[in-house]
Amino acid sequence: MQIIFMNRLSRMAGREEEEFAQLWIGEEEGVWSLGWRDFSVNAVLESTDNLWYEGGSWNEMLCVYRHELAVKMGAGYRPLIDGGLHEEEVLPRRGREQLKLQYYSEHYSQESVYDELCAWRRGRASSERKAPYMLASNRLLRLLSTFLPKTTEELLQIPGIGEAKAAQYGADWLAVTSVAPRERDFPLSWVYEEIGDEEFSSWLYKQKELKYKRQLEQLRLNRTLLQGIDGGLGLEQLKNETGVSRRELLEALEELEKDGYSVEKLIELELESMAHEEQQAVWKAYEEFGDLFLKPVLYKVYGDTPPAAAGGLEIHYERLRLIRIRFRREQAGSLDSATSF
């Protein structure tokens, strides 16, 4: 095997003890290998090897590399030589400060206040018929339940809250946060001095670990989907194969189409039992209402009471999404043809 990349990393195991490790990538006859070698503190000649990846996909190997390296750096390891395949992101000052506020909120939020804000979000989302995350993310509610603003001026110092959002929901938030006791005041510059650089860096790598894990899972899911579609599998079989819900599978199929892959074989299979006239009615509804929202199309085609079907209402939405993939593909093709002149 030919070693094409190697780096050494270290971390402090105690006040005076330093641990070393080696990260390597090798290739032999088109097969990529990625590994980690721990060296004993007491005996340099003693080592423990861990094979992280072995296979033919360079892209998958890179995903594994980034994820596993982020895990190790989150545990305190740092490369002795920067660069290579390691991505070192330089954060602007404002971005770094906002991330420090997020870090602090994940460790010191008041759970009772957070729970009350979550209850508000559920009720308001239901009354507005919106997804809860559209009102406020978990991250934002953590920030609110940590720093406990008492005025609109303080509220606007929370990352993610602008004038419009403060005007829309600020009174509701302040009704919860302003009555909770707090120990520290605004402005929040004291947070930046209270957080140690090393603990913050480890937390940043934990965030990267989660990000790269999602990327790796998505890459492997896409590969399984494409292989399954090529093999003639339907949604239910792919669900059993991947352990992913049918809704998540449909979202992944939409993304694959955006990336230039064809999922038409699966669409044909899933729509075999749907009458051609019914499919045409859905298509015309997309032409009339656009393809952003499914509910207007559903009501246009089926009225207020869609016909009963095995799988309930969800099967109707699945078919709408599958036809929407075709519709968007044709619309994109028409746009490309128009702009080529």
Label each PLM-derived region with a short phrase.
Residues A119, P181-L210:
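Linker/hinge segments immediately adjacent to helix-turn-helix/homeobox DNA-binding domains
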Residues S126-N138, S201-L221, V263-E278:
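Short, Lys/Arg-enriched anionic-surface-contact patches
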Residues T177-E193, G260-A275, R328-F341:
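Short Lys/Arg-enriched helix C-cap and helix-to-coil transition segments
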Residues A167-T177:
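Accessory beta->alpha helical hairpin/"wing" motif in late/C-terminal subdomains of nucleic-acid enzymes
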Residues M1-L135, T146-L148, E153-Q157, Q168, ...:
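Structure-specific DNA junction-binding interface
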Residues K165, E248:
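Residues in the helix-turn-helix
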Residues L225, S273-D291:
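Positively charged, polyanion-binding regions of nucleic-acid-associated proteins
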